[in-house]
């Protein structure tokens, strides 16, 4: 079983807006209710900016979500894999690619 949650960011930013916190909380709630579950957070950037900048922002976006899970929701950091994936191309609209995608992997059957 898996669950996905998408956290969006403003251009050039890697801080999680208050409006996005429910999407982080969904992940935290799931992890707290399923102690064997882990989450991969993949940060992405939209295409403007240099590759170096985009890779840094993408990683920072993943880390920002991880920080909230660890600090606010007391999720063990070892259950969270935060990755920067550079420029995203999942969505046709470039602006929509400013995201962290949280994919929960639940080993429970």
Task: Tell where the protein language model's regions lie, with residue ranges.
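Periplasmic peptidoglycan-binding/tethering modules of Gram-negative envelope proteins
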Residues: 1-38, 93-96, 100-109
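Conserved phosphate/oxyanion-binding catalytic-loop motifs
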Residues: 41
């Amino acid at each position: 079983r898996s669950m996905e949650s998408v956290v969006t960011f403003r251009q050039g930013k890697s801080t999680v807006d208050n409006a996005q916190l429910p999407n982080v909380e969904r992940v935290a709630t799931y992890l707290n209710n399923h102690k064997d579950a882990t989450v991969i957070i993949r940060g992405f950037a939209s295409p403007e900016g240099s590759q170096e900048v985009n890779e840094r922002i993408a990683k920072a976006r993943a880390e920002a979500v991880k920080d909230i899970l660890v600090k606010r929701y007391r999720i063990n950091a070892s259950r969270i894999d935060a990755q920067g994936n550079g420029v995203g191309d999942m969505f046709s609209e470039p602006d929509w690619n400013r995201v962290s995608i949280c994919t929960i992997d639940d080993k429970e059957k």
